[in-house]
């Protein structure tokens, strides 16, 4: 992605981007909790990026498998969202419309007896699309102005590499065009945006592959020159090591983009390296926060360390690796 020239002057006010994964919005109780977090940051003018609820993606793929066998069934997906909406006390007209659309797609799959990559991306998108509608409706019911957006509504476009699409360069200009009014205070409805999905230039829905929801969040944050991008998880940031293995593991206050990338490559639960690309271009900080410990500062990922650099920031491990050390006199003086 190439950073366009001439867009720097659009950013006179600060804002943040808040990304919540599927486990954070898995049920009504968690949705209420996330809503309370959003409300706590309301004065920061947050843009919220959401994944699909809990196991919705798995339910959608199971529905596709059934459709190939001529069984059209949206029951699992419908039950989860209808029951959750009932517990939240919200109307779900927009979700019902999506369920009708989903049933039509599954009917088409049942006729073709196959799921193409394009159809799979279209299918999977229903999870994120229902999730943002649910959250926006609940926030509104609590007196918090909010509006849901499918990613393409704010100009998030991609190529046509289904299941692993790449964002187009025009996204850098598209996002500010749609969100500047909110950032500058002319619009007060909190944008609730689908993560993970986009549309290509033909209007086909695509998915962004691994780390796709994080990529959506960092792309919005970078394009809008946000104060920071927050990704909310169930730990107090990036830990010194795996807390499941070492009970005394502690959160690391600060790491660089490069350190975060290395940790992610070797298995640490950090942002996918691909999702760091937009923020690295403009230096937008990314903060990993704990949704169950809001007061914890978490870990901030920055371009350069702002204080004393620790000799070792964190340790991660990769299991089931075999090291083979070959020693031979014939290798004397050879590289490697």
What does each model-identified segment do?
Residues 297-336:
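A conserved regulatory-domain signal marking ACT and ACT-like small-molecule sensing domains
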Residues 279:
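Acidic-aromatic/histidine active-site loop/patch
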